């Protein structure tokens, strides 16, 4: 053992020398940041924090005491003290968030990866910098092989001089000033290592006290601008008591510019607004003056109105306009190659909100640009304005809209490999094609075909013919419009909202070796309406699917005979349904909240027609075209909340609840509309569909997971996400929940929801995970650890897992679970 240890030490010593063997004499190899120290005082001094608030409260209490007596004065004093305490607490939170944000920018300014960095870290390196060794070996080589090694495998050494810690310290110093730390000090030390040709850098940051905004005064601009400022003062981003922040100043300039432009001041720019700050008058306070730039151009002080509109539409890769037409004072010019416009004028006009004679408004320009972009048929689009002439007496802006149509066709090909838990593996492919502006009305015609086949692996293959004959394939055709196609029922005010309509047809054929063959057909109409940034409506007034069981084996017949719920979900049936989804999103400071509510009904309209014709609404076994149809109501809601602790760490929560109730024509909803639980995006200590309903736990088999669905679902998740190194993040989580049956089923004992057994039937798991953020993609690994199984495991007590090893769940996934 001692010999191996000495060998490792000798190897590391030699390699350490080899990383600096051929470095320039006056250079020192940079080996990363040794430490980054902060010396901060976040809490406000009591005098600084209470200041004006306390003085006002004391004055108020004195007057109140003179008017109503000492008793009331004491009550008022206690109330005001509570108000002061809450105000200080809120102010401390603002200071803490401001400081953490500044720290993240300082880290970014000081960060610099050395050679051999682990995942881009500025602190940690691996012991074998092979590319640096190659540099030292071949940097002076004159052979072809040496030059080839240098060009393809060597890494240029990172020197302390190229890191330039002095400049980085200055950048960090200026960053702190931008966040209100005007008395900050940032220094650095170069720390030599055992090899004097190598060094690390330590940075020392002393922010000092943060300065807060005191008085904010808006100096006169010009009469109408002053009226706009006064009317929108409550929307100002500069608030007394907030930490000084340059970003708030920039945001306030942009806010005022938008307000001015929404009132006709087309030529107004943010740089026409300046600030003057006084940090001397009151200690640790900043007095701000918002003032107009003296050199503001005369054009920026006058409102403008919309004139004529010209629309230029170029075909893909055609740069000449050959024809034009005039309609209602608007000129439409286009590239003509087929004796007709490439885009119908009526497809463009509903997306224009710049009406002749109207006062120019930034909002109308933004909506027009957004609606044109959402048409998804242009490779480039520009909305520009041209003043009739340059004199101040002319207040008219002509609109020029120029767009080049995108290439008409898009295609994609996807290949995949499936590996299922029942030992089935196999490849799959899909091919999709889209045609933009298919009928010259901005519509998109899409077609997608896909297929896959599987075979069973392992020692016990089910049947001799199951090698390749488990397969499925299907096709989807869709026609989408970037607007609501409601056949005259749409409201005019909806035109300004982002919307779309999608008509879809689909078909799928599934063959499961030794079980069944099944075909499904579907048709649907879907509407989407986006109301602002926070609210989204999705409505499907018509959706009809038809499932047909083509053939089945005796083995599968025995399974569905023993399970009536499975039989109902697999029988030939129509599912006529309507569906509505409401999504609400709110993002404010450190909070991101999302609420999604979905309501789906099936068969009720059809049953209503039967009732009008004299048959009972809840009468069972009604048929549509000679085939039974499903009848149910399904409601689900999901709420997520992400609370940001620091710019790189947060706490995420999710709460999901859902219920599906079947009645009338069916005792059970179709299988696809039932709830299941477990897996990479649910309770991660248990695999998908391995728990529930309730305490029911079937014997394991290839298709036992089919049984484990329910009518009611409740799930809660809590996850803490934190940084580890560079783009590698960690997570710790807790998951809980289950699915239950509303009605008792003798084939699934313990599956019914009972309040007396509710706590025992909640599955609980915890665990840890890793997330690697590639900016465009997040790779995720989670290790779930079971705490409590909702079924009988043979062990007593709340922790009832049979063994620690069997309680683990491993999940590789893409993206966050919620």
What are these regions (language model features)?
Residues 1-29, 175, 655, 814-818:
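Bacterial Sec-dependent N-terminal signal peptides
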């Amino acid at each position: 053992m001692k010999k191996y240890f000495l060998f490792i030490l000798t190897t590391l010593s030699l390699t350490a020398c080899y990383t600096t063997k051929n470095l320039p004499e006056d250079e020192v190899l940079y080996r990363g940041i040794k430490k980054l120290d902060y010396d901060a005082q976040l809490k406000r001094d009591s005098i600084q924090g209470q200041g004006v608030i306390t003085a006002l409260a004391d004055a108020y209490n004195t007057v109140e005491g003179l008017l109503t007596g000492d008793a009331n004065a004491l009550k008022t004093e206690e109330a005001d003290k509570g108000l002061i305490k809450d105000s200080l607490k809120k102010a401390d939170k603002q200071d803490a968030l401001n400081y953490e944000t500044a720290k993240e920018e300082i880290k970014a300014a000081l960060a610099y990866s050395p050679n051999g960095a682990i995942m881009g870290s500025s602190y940690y390196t691996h012991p074998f910098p092979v590319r640096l060794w190659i540099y030292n070996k071949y940097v002076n080589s004159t052979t072809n092989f040496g030059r080839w090694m240098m060009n393809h495998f060597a890494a240029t050494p990172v020197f302390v001089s190229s890191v330039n810690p002095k400049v980085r310290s200055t950048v960090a110093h200026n960053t702190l000033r931008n966040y209100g730390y005007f008395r900050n000090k940032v220094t650095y030390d170069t720390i030599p290592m055992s090899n004097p040709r190598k060094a690390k850098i330590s940075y020392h940051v002393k922010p000092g006290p943060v300065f807060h905004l005191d008085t904010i005064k808006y100096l006169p601009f010009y009469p109408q601008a002053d009226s706009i400022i006064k009317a929108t003062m409550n929307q100002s981003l500069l608030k007394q008591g907030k930490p000084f922040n340059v970003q708030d100043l920039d945001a306030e300039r942009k806010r005022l510019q938008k307000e001015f432009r929404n009132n006709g001041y087309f030529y107004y720019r943010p740089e026409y607004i300046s600030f003057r700050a006084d940090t001397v008058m009151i200690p640790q306070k900043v007095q701000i003056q918002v003032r107009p730039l003296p050199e503001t151009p005369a054009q920026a002080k006058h409102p403008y109105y919309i004139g004529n509109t010209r629309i230029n539409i170029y075909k893909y890769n055609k740069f000449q306009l050959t024809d034009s037409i005039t309609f209602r004072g608007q000129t439409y010019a286009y590239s003509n190659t087929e004796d007709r416009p490439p885009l119908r004028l009526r497809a463009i006009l509903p997306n224009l909100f710049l009406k002749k004679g109207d006062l120019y408004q930034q909002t109308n320009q933004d909506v027009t640009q957004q609606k044109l972009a959402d048409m998804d048929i242009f490779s480039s689009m520009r909305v520009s304005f041209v003043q009739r002439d340059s004199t101040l007496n002319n207040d008219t802006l002509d609109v020029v809209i120029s767009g080049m149509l995108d290439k008409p066709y898009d295609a994609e090909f996807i290949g995949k490999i499936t590996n299922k838990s029942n030992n089935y593996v196999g490849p799959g492919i899909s091919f999709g094609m889209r045609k933009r502006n298919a009928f010259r009305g901005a519509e998109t015609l899409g077609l997608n075909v896909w297929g896959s086949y599987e075979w069973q692996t392992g020692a016990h293959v089910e049947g001799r013919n199951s090698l390749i004959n488990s397969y499925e394939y299907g096709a989807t055709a869709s026609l989408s419009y970037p607007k609501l196609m409601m056949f005259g029922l749409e409201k005019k005010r909806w035109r300004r909202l982002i919307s779309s309509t999608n008509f879809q047809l689909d078909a799928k054929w599934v063959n499961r070796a030794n079980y069944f063959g099944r075909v499904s057909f579907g048709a649907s109409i879907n509407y989407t309406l986006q109301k602002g940034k926070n609210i989204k409506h999705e409505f499907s007034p018509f959706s009809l699917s038809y499932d047909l069981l083509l053939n089945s084996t005796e083995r599968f017949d025995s399974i569905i005979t023993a399970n009536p719920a499975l039989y109902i979900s697999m029988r030939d049936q129509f599912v006529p349904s309507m569906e509505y989804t409401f999504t609400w999103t709110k993002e404010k400071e450190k909070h991101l909240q999302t609420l999604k509510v979905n309501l789906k009904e099936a068969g009720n309209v059809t049953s209503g027609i039967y009732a009008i014709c004299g048959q009972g609404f809840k009468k069972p076994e009604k048929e549509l075209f000679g085939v039974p149809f499903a009848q149910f109501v399904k409601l689900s809601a999901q709420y997520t909340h992400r609370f940001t602790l620091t710019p790189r760490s947060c706490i995420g929560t999710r709460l999901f609840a859902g219920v599906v109730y079947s009645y009338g024509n069916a005792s059970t909803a179709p299988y696809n509309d039932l709830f299941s639980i477990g897996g990479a995006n649910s309770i991660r200590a248990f695999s998908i569909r391995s728990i529930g309903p309730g305490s029911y736990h079937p014997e394991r088999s290839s298709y036992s997971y089919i049984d484990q669905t329910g009518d009611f679902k409740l799930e809660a998740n809590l996850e803490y996400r934190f940084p580890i190194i560079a783009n590698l993040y960690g997570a710790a989580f807790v998951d809980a929940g289950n699915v239950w049956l509303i009605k008792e089923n003798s084939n699934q004992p313990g599956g019914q929801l009972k309040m007396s057994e509710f706590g025992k039937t909640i599955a609980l798991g915890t665990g840890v995970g890793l997330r690697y953020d590639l900016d465009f993609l997040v790779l995720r690994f989670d290790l779930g650890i079971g705490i409590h199984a909702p079924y009988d495991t043979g062990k007593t007590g709340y922790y009832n897992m049979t063994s620690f090893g069997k309680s683990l769940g491993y999940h590789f996934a893409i993206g966050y679970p919620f």
